[in-house]
Amino acid sequence: MAEYVFSDAPKDSHGNGVKDAVPGKQPEELPPAPRYFQGENTAGFMRPVRFEGDITNLEVVGEIPKSIEGTFYRVMPEPHLPSFIPNDPWFNGDGNISGFYFKDGHVDLKQRYVRTEKFVREAEARRSLLGKYRNRYTDLVEFKIRSTANTNIVYWRGQLLALKEDSPPYAMDPETLETFGVYDFDGQLPSLTFTAHPKFDPVTREMVCFGYEAKGDGTRDICYYSFGPDGKIAETVWLVSPVCGMIHDFAVTENFVIFPIIPLVCDVERMKQGGDHWQWDYSIPMYIGVLPRRGAQGSDVKWFEAPHGFAGHVANAFEDDKGHIQLQMAYAKDNVFFWWPDANGKGPRPGEVEAHFANFVLDYQSDKLPLAEPTYLVDDDMEFPRIDDRVATRKHKHTFFCIFDRKPGVTDFEFVMPRAGGGAPMSNGLAHLNHETGDIQRYLPGPRKLTGECIFIPRNSEAAEGDGYVMVLLANYEDMCSELAVLDTKDLTNEVALIKLPVRLRPGLHGNWVDKSDVDGHPAPL
């Protein structure tokens, strides 16, 4: 428990919020703050509820299998106070953590905001202070740790880590969801930034990590590092990327780490003028860096050049019999984050871009850096792929992912769209791909419901890969409340249980399952 950086805790570092943040500036000198939420990104289902509390024994339709015992943690970006930035992006909301605690066929909910420096100081000031997404030059006061802690929540050595890729993690209590403070791995964190997608090797029990813009905004520095099960840092490699681009997710195999760069580029001078941190660049490829996982130097990285496109979330990567890397991920041919267009304002319209499940083949021994088009594993418009984590970094047979099925009748768009609000991606179903047989099962929750990212839970520790349950949070636009569906992978098309929430939870980004049987919060390998 000595690994929490209490010296960086917001209240201790900054005293009485606004007045101490910028010498000579008093709260009354700040521009007026809005008193209510405005714009489509905080309308309809996206309107912040700002709920914190405990709900015991949630309503259940059907039966939750009693073998399901553990906790489903998820995080959503939800502004605690109205932003002074007009129609602030969904990504800039405060991290609000859900814990669904399962035991004996029952489930309880706990909901807490992460007490980041931003959250604490804005609560004290009773107004928004943080400016544009990842642009510190637009803040009303100076922040030491600018994180919103709103992207992912993972379990590590007895605590939760709330993650945002521009900052160090925040540590939380897994049972109470109390925030402990900024976490720097007992002084070992080498980078200013920490990925929102660390990978957990089920065999070595390592947490494999990286930070991009690792020396600050606009820097091309990447720091790759890993921590062993004893909490000690095991690998540290500094490397330089071809561009200062977004690296939201990455992949890990037994012997390599892989860094796909989204062609959204940062320019600090643009930021200083009040512009966005990110701007799409149609002139560059989608770089994919490959680095040996053990004993590497920065010069060992190879930057392959994939056809221009958007690197979405990674399902997994593994090495085949030839030693080639098979990288499986969501991939789009244009800018998924359309609200950050190119320098001329060019970009796709909302909902125009589709992402598909792509397989890239990477040969580290080859000097041929341009890559051909990937192969596509399914026809669905998809995102947020998940696997059975017991086979992570090795060849997998099953993938579960969100789909967006545009066929008539699947979703009642005439009813849903006026109630949806804006800013968050849409999916209206899930799919389960069996890579060995090519079979696909699909789950469609109904014409007035949308789905979030799913998680997979093994039926038991000895179950075959992909045999178990899938959980997914649903947005019910008829009742304007949330539901948690439990599905059996033997028949993904029907719910075995539907858990009804008396509150509305905004669309979230990521979540993870911690099973009661997991000794260190992560499953044993198959």
UniProtKB/Swiss-Prot annotation:
Catalyzed chemical reaction(s): trans-resveratrol + O2 = 3,5-dihydroxybenzaldehyde + 4-hydroxybenzaldehyde; piceatannol + O2 = 3,5-dihydroxybenzaldehyde + 3,4-dihydroxybenzaldehyde
Alphabetical keyword list: Dioxygenase, Iron, Metal-binding, Oxidoreductase
Top-level class of the enzyme under EC nomenclature: oxidoreductase
Cofactor(s) listed: Fe(2+)
Enzyme Commission number: 1.13.11.-
Swiss-Prot/TrEMBL GO biological process terms: carotene catabolic process
Residues that coordinate or bind piceatannol: Y133, K164, E383
Coiled-coil residues: none
Region annotated Disordered, chain positions: 1-33
Residues annotated as binding Fe cation: H197, H248, H313, H510
Induction, as annotated: Expression is induced ba resveratrol but is not dependent on light.
InterPro entries in the record: Carotenoid_Oase
Cofactor note: Binds 1 Fe(2+) ion per subunit.
Functional note: Dioxygenase that cleaves the interphenyl C-alpha-C-beta double bond of resveratrol to yield 3,5-dihydroxybenzaldehyde and 4-hydroxybenzaldehyde. Also cleaves piceatannol, a compound that differs from resveratrol only in the occurrence of an additional hydroxyl group, which leads to the production of 3,4-dihydroxybenzaldehyde and 3,5-hydroxybenzaldehyde. Is not able to cleave trans-stilbene, 4-monohydroxy-trans-stilbene, 3,5-dihydroxy-trans-stilbene (pinosylvin), trismethoxy-resveratrol, and 3,3',5-trihydroxy-4'-methoxystilbene-3-O-beta-D-glucoside. Is not involved in carotenoid metabolism.
Family: Belongs to the carotenoid oxygenase family.
Protein name per UniProt: Carotenoid cleavage oxygenase 1
Lineage: Eukaryota, Fungi, Dikarya, Ascomycota, Pezizomycotina
